[in-house]
């Protein structure tokens, strides 16, 4: 088993130097040009003190700058801690402190007391210093840390190694295949593992990426028709937007795959795609699995509606209940294993031991397998709210609500929304005088916009069982009756 590999981008620039690597709007960059840009960023980062083994926070939007920073950190041998640009300042500061980063590189206005903050422009306008570029990557070494929320609501830093990212890209290629003319349209944020994984595929496959800086359905719709795109990653909301713009038309036959994540797609949506000849591949994955770990081929779009498919070639999946593997059609916890699965969480030994046992990742998600081994996901970590492809954990919102002096109890569940799929709804027991408007405003100051409840309802008491555990299913029933 290999322990090291040549520096990925440097090797790609050597093998196919003049092949187009990245397109952003009208700009085209070849692999050798990308390598040269990254070396320059690497030398500037070296001057500001970034060294091998250190953790550097990256708070940037999709763009050439973010791409070069991520690669430059790997050239130095530093770990990139990728931060969600939609989080509140308070949330970002907590994650940076937890990850023990030595500095933040950003393209946004941001101030932090205890952490040096460098704007990308500031870094690039400063002096250079000769950098010690990593000629080889150790597959066991951490490359990135991406935060994901747990059922406790406290975010956990998922450590993904070079080996994890390599295995993810290989598994995807064995699943979807590779073509010389492939072009993947990247519209997912690169601070999410789904977006980041495309950067890995880009340099490993030597595949052209058409990068969209910000989600723009009109631009994407046009690009699918005119830019030679063969693969695109989407969530249901994006797919719905594209079909609205497509109307009675169709996309070119060269579009061979729409990789759909973020939860099962409604059957009418899939039927429309079948009618229009759009091949939709439904997937199941998470940050801990370096992106997808299961995929449903377009061949089964309608015969296996609601299924997330079967595991990637080098991965395994089973359903457990009370620690025992159960037969088909019996519901239980989804447990997965593979070289793309994280080895654990940063500084969270207890959570790592609880979640990963003998190499098997206990996802906390509920599902079952049918008689042919197709996975059906019933609940994403049971309480998870998926809003426009973003994961929202009720416990984090409840923690914020309970920090208000006029809130005695709080419970949050998902509420169906035509635009986003789901949005948070809060139920509150008051300890003093407070209005719904005041509660929502309080949340706006503490949480990312997409996490702020769209409604706050007041109850005399929250439904609980004998152990005083909150009964979310009863709150969901109240939402349905509203």
From Swiss-Prot:
Coiled coil: none annotated. SUPFAM superfamilies: Acetyl-CoA synthetase-like. One of its GO terms (biological process) is menaquinone biosynthetic process. It holds the Pfam family AMP-binding_C. InterPro entries: AMP-bd_C, AMP-bd_C_sf, AMP-binding_CS, AMP-dep_synth/lig_dom, ANL_N_sf, ATP-dep_AMP-bd_enzyme, MenE. It comes from the Bacteria. It catalyses: 2-succinylbenzoate + ATP + CoA = 2-succinylbenzoyl-CoA + AMP + diphosphate. Keywords: ATP-binding, Ligase, Menaquinone biosynthesis, Nucleotide-binding. PROSITE patterns: AMP_BINDING. One of its GO terms (molecular function) is ATP binding. Its EC number is 6.2.1.26. Signal peptide: none annotated. The keyword ATP-binding applies. Pathway: Quinol/quinone metabolism; 1,4-dihydroxy-2-naphthoate biosynthesis; 1,4-dihydroxy-2-naphthoate from chorismate: step 5/7; Quinol/quinone metabolism; menaquinone biosynthesis. The keyword Ligase applies. It is an enzyme of class 6 (ligase). Converts 2-succinylbenzoate (OSB) to 2-succinylbenzoyl-CoA (OSB-CoA). Belongs to the ATP-dependent AMP-binding enzyme family. MenE subfamily. HAMAP family: MenE. PANTHER family: LONG-CHAIN-FATTY-ACID--COA LIGASE, NONRIBOSOMAL PEPTIDE SYNTHASE PES1 (EUROFUNG)-RELATED. This is 2-succinylbenzoate--CoA ligase. The gene is menE.
